Amino acid sequence: GTSMCALIAWSDKYFKGGTSTVNDTRNDGWQPLKGLKIIDFSMLLPGPLATLIMADLGAEVIKVEPPGGDYARHMKSFLFEGSNRNKSSIVVDLKAPDAKDIIKRLAEYGDVAIEGFRPGVADRLGIGPDQLQAINPALIYCSLSGFGQTGPISTKAGHDLAYIAMGGGLAQKGQLRQAPSRS
């Protein structure tokens, strides 16, 4: 059978600036990042929020989503729409063998790549800094992770609730001198 990558409508026109952007709320005013091309492999909130700010400031952002889309697409909230306006989107199964050609073309095209995987995941998917910068040495690579790239908890998934708990925020709920209450 044909993999998801082979089914993607991927034209040379795209790489000549012929993108279509949904929910474009930019104006013709101050756009200091105009002309900068961002390849966004991130999902949920931290990475998409960072690239949203770049898009609002004029950068062209291409959001790379897995088959089925960014996890935030399926949440019943404004999270996805609110953090992904002014971006183009493409579906790529990064685990598929034929994804390599698309990844290569994205790396050649982009000025910046951003991902939000736990350490080691991007390398396994073929989108790590060494892999992409071998294609485009000028590519700026941004890696976001909840607990850094090294250290004892670096491989743990980073989410808001974990940060609140580790900072003692959850212990604040309840009565003084009693065990914390559960929600």
Where are these regions (language model features)?
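N-terminal helix-loop segment corresponding to the beta1-alpha1 unit
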Residues: 7-183
